[in-house]
């Protein structure tokens, strides 16, 4: 456990510079007050993270097997027993730190079955372009210092990435000559986003519902020096601004885009590609709650494929459609649901459920095995990746509520199987 | 006490002057011991008819990190084509030029390598790099930290903060990122690309900081010398892959002014502009300069034909190369006021004039550089080709008639432009042992590796003698890692993990406040979060911290 910076007479402790693991921005200026097992987040934290960090003083719930309280060992044994008969297990949720994902890979390789993260829709929209065509992307500190024109494509990402503008496009940047220009293309900033953007110039380019792909195609034509057909949204000023910018960034929250998100991203990437022939520009593709990016990275270096990978006979294969959690679950007999960062409910299905889950999870249907797990960055140390993929942040331990980590639980289930 | 006797083999240990000496090698508790010190009962490996060497050391191989993951993502067809089946000691990975962590350890170990160093740790990605390297079995690893494009350093130099401030910063970064050496990639050029410069010559000024690659190089050479790092600056120079860059390379050798400098993947920096296609071999000139300058060492970055993927921090160069991507996709990233990366898939073809000549240029360098202690066997994995091609490369170096057969297959236009046939040299087994073990250990300052003298780590390899040197070096008969037999008759038989090498030079503590401020204001998160703790390296176990002059 890290040394608290301030000890309080009450026996509680205040921890400063705590890393927040939830949305993927990796803020590390959170203050936590911990008293016994009770946790309250103070300065630095955004509203959503405050709710997710909060813990009461009550003891952690016991593990359960078929709805009855059971010792941890019995629950581990029950999970191992269920998995030893599994024909088609699905590992989903995957809200775990890197160590947890490493252990899940090892177990899935032995039991067979597919693995996906519950929030991977946006990631795969991004991969649809990056994997097939590629892109030029950038990281948070580059945007912060170089980016003079920040174009938000589609809905305001700060809905998911609460402190996005405060962190990534603050008022000043090392290489900025004047105020930063923020353009919302096909979306609009919330009041809170506007507050974070104070000091920057905000512009909104409205795009009618469903016409974002078309707008980006026109923008691409304009930055290429072509003349798009008349009509539609007036984009010539934006095209000129992009060409004149020193370092333009097109950013989007892939998970927040509509059904045509794949195409929106492809067109936005094409705009950046064209700009880079003469000037500098980059994409900031946002995705990444609950260590989604870390799970994907851990898969790539251990398995060679991204998430949505299936194991059969010890051989892995990747299929974005077939191994997506929702479609794989249709033919699953066992769902191993992992959610250590928040009390996310497993999706409805006919499968038996082994839940390695946040203690506060409220299930629609009682799982066959419930093992309450600790949260990386609160109950145990761990590692999570930021949304920009390059930076990963160390998560520390701040309390002892007697909760086992996902990695430890999976390792013990794995041993119980053999 | 655990002990192992490797009996009846011929010991090839150039660092200790042993060439084919018939003697037993004894490993006690993971270290090489004197012949007399073996306990009575000891596990014995019969190495009769075999050549016994120290474990192989790869000085430059891109085995981990963000750029490797991007390469895996881009090369999903390769991942499908090369799967590693699940087995008692095998993971579920795959790939060839994009090999996964477990497979990387296995394939290197089977060839007799026990230490492989990652030459491009971008500081912002160091934590990922170490986490991934910990999943590579069998191998000792370590990282070279990429500096020379980081805004903090360029600002220090540009503002005239002085050598001492630079030294403190370099030492701070080495401690924070747990690396063992300093790499420079296209000094100042990656940074300049962020300000839209497309080229960077040795004496050209960065558009923002107005300092030149020469200044950056000389400042960092001085820093590692004054900090007392064993490994000199590991340099990927300016103008990678550009015809005519031989002059840049010669100028860079001169710019070192006699100070130690390691120049990496020099094949990609040895191009002239002669001939009807304005592309020619500069190998003879470069080799001559290396021969004349004992402060210079090089690794080759040999090109091997076939599909691979090029992965580099040099986004300026990779953006230029994007048009030749094959398959036609590529990814670039600017990274954290620190560096960048560019990943471009590429297939080297023997019928391509340029690729065939690149192949010949690499071999010319190997054969024309006279001192085997200053040249190292690399393909710059995966940039020139995957490391699994090393046995083939060894055969090309050792077997002149084989080399000439391969040469005959090249594009005719390239054959006309190469003098390779005029070079009669064949590497001896001793020279192979030098360029793959003894010399890398020496240039990295790993005094207890790369040789079989008493006290060295118990990394020992037995190769069966075979006139076909490619077959001989493809699968070792036995590989011993820290005293444990990990390969027997070419098969993995155990699973062990290596150590992470790092240096921890001392620095003036007053830099901490400067770094805190830099991270708070510029980078946007805390320096305290950025710094990697000892516990994060292999769970706090298995670091090797090497001494430096300015030690804490």
What are these regions (language model features)?
Chain A
Residues 12-13, 17-29, 257-258, 286-304:
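N-terminal, charge-rich interaction modules
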Residues 1-219, 254, 415-418:
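N-terminal export/assembly segments and adjacent metallocofactor-ligating motifs
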């Amino acid at each position: 456990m890290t040394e608290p910076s301030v000890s309080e007479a009450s026996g509680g402790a205040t921890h400063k510079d705590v890393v927040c693991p939830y949305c993927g921005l990796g803020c590390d200026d959170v203050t936590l007050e911990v008293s016994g097992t009770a946790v309250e987040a103070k300065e630095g934290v955004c509203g959503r993270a405050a709710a997710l960090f909060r813990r009461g003083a009550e003891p952690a719930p016991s593990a359960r097997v078929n709805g009855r309280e059971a010792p941890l060992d019995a629950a581990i044994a029950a999970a191992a027993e269920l998995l030893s008969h599994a024909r088609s297990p699905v590992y989903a949720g995957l809200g775990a730190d890197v160590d947890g994902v490493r252990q899940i890979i090892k177990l899935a390789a032995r039991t067979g079955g597919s693995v996906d993260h519950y929030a991977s829709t946006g990631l795969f929209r991004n991969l649809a372009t990056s994997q097939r065509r590629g892109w030029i992307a950038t990281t948070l500190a580059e945007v912060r210092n170089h980016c003079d024109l920040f174009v938000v494509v589609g809905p305001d990402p700060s809905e998911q990435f609460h402190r996005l503008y405060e962190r990534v496009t603050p008022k000043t940047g090392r290489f900025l000559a004047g105020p930063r220009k923020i353009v919302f293309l096909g979306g609009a900033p919330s009041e809170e986003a506007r507050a974070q953007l104070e000091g920057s110039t905000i512009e909104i380019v409205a795009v009618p519902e469903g016409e974002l792909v078309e707008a980006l195609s026109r923008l691409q034509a304009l930055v290429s020096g072509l003349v798009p057909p008349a009509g539609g949204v007036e984009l010539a000023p934006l095209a000129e601004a992009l060409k004149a910018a020193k370092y333009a960034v097109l950013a989007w929250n892939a998970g927040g885009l509509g059904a045509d998100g794949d195409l929106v991203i492809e067109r936005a990437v094409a705009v950046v590609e064209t700009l880079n022939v003469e000037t500098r520009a980059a994409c900031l593709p946002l995705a990444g709650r609950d260590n989604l990016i870390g799970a994907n990275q851990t898969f790539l270096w251990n398995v060679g494929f991204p998430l949505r990978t299936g194991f059969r006979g010890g051989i892995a294969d990747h299929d974005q459609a077939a191994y997506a959690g929702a479609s794989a679950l249709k033919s699953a007999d066992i769902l191993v649901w992992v959610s250590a960062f928040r009390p996310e409910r497993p999706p409805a299905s006919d499968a038996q459920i082994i839940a390695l889950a946040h203690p506060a999870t409220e299930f629609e249907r009682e799982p066959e095995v419930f093992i309450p797990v600790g949260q990386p960055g609160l109950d145990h140390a761990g590692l999570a990746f930021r949304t920009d993929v390059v930076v990963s942040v160390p998560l520390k331990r701040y309390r002892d509520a007697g909760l086992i980590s996902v990695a430890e639980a999976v390792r013990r289930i794995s041993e119980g199987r053999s | 006490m655990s002990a192992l006797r490797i009996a009846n083999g011929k010991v090839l240990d150039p660092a200790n002057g042993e060439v084919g000496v018939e003697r037993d090698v004894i490993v006690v508790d993971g270290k090489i011991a004197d012949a007399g010190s073996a306990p009575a009962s000891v596990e014995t490996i019969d190495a009769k008819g075999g050549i016994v060497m120290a474990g192989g050391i790869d000085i430059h191989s891109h085995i981990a990190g963000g750029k490797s993951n991007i390469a895996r993502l881009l090369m999903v067809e390769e991942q499908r084509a090369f799967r590693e089946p699940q087995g008692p000691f095998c993971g579920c990975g795959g790939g060839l030029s994009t090999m996964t962590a477990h497979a990387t350890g296995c394939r290197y170990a089977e060839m007799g390598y026990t230490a492989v160093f990652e030459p491009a740790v971008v500081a912002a990605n160091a934590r990922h790099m170490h986490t991934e390297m910990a999943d590579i079995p069998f191998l000792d690893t370590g990282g070279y930290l990429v500096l020379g494009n980081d805004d903090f350093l360029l600002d220090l130099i540009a503002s005239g903060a002085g050598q001492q401030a630079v030294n403190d910063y370099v030492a701070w970064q080495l401690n924070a990122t747990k690396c063992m050496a300093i790499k420079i990639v296209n000094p100042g050029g990656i940074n300049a690309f962020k300000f839209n410069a497309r080229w960077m010559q040795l004496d050209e000024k960065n558009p923002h900081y107005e300092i030149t690659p020469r200044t950056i190089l000389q400042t960092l050479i001085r820093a590692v010398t004054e900090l007392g790092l064993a490994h000199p600056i590991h340099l990927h120079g300016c103008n990678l892959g550009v015809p005519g860059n031989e002059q840049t390379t010669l100028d860079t050798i001169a710019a070192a002014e006699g100070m130690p400098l390691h120049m990496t993947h020099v094949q990609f920096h040895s191009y002239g502009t002669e001939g009807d296609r304005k592309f020619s071999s500069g190998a003879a000139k470069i080799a001559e300069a290396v021969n004349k300058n004992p402060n210079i060492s090089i690794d080759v970055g040999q090109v091997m034909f076939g599909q691979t993927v090029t992965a580099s921090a040099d986004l300026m160069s990779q953006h230029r190369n994007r048009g030749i991507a094959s398959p036609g996709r590529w990814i670039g990233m600017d990274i954290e006021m620190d560096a960048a990366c560019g990943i471009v898939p590429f297939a080297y073809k023997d019928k391509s004039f340029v690729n065939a000549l690149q192949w010949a240029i690499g071999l010319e360098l190997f054969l024309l550089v006279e001192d085997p202690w200053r040249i190292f066997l690399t393909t710059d994995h995966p940039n020139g080709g995957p490391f699994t091609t090393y046995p083939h490369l060894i055969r090309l170096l050792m077997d002149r008639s084989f080399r000439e057969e391969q040469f005959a297959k090249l594009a005719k236009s390239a054959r006309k432009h190469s003098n390779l046939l005029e070079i009669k040299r064949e590497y001896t087994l001793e020279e192979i042992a030098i360029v793959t073990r003894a010399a890398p250990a020496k240039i990295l300052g790993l005094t207890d590796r790369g040789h079989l003298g008493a006290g060295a780590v118990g990394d020992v390899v037995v190769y069966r003698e075979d006139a076909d040197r490619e077959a001989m070096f493809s699968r070792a008969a036995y590989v011993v890692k820290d005293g444990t037999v990990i390969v027997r008759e070419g098969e993995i038989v155990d699973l062990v993990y290596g150590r992470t090498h790092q240096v921890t030079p001392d620095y003036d503590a007053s830099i901490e406040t400067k770094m805190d401020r830099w991270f708070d204001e510029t980078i946007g998160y805390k320096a305290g979060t950025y710094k990697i703790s000892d516990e994060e390296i292999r769970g706090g176990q298995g670091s090797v911290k090497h001494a430096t002059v300015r030690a804490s």
